[in-house]
Amino acid sequence: LALTLRRTYATRADAVRRFRFFPPAPQAPETLRAAIAEHSVRREADGRYGFAFDPRWFSIPSRPRPELSSVQCPTLILRGRESEILSREGARALMDELPRGRLVEISGAGHQTHLENPDAVLLALRNFLAALP
């Protein structure tokens, strides 16, 4: 029931101010949070303001993904070392299913690696792409 209740705010400014990353991204700069918040707020049917995401996402159960073994292209998995969403074991399990998978752990980042340590993400992407035939 709690997941179906949406928190709304009287003004757009209130909603933007209350926007937070989930999971938290403590390394992300406040200016980035504010910029993303500006694009993540929408006006609801009742005229109040809420966040533009589907709350049903949080009720999707984890499941085995046997189709991963059929992915034949090189695949890069980026995992933030401090991620509370994707464990090291979970990332390795994904990588083990991908015939051409490569795992890179990003230090100084949780689940949202591209927000918390964009320089390390860029380096990992460049290295991955440079190694492609």
Task: Show where each model-derived region lies.
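Conserved serine/cysteine hydrolase catalytic core
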Residues: 41-97, 102-105
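Catalytic active-site module of serine/aspartate enzymes centered on a nucleophile-bearing elbow/loop
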Residues: 99-133
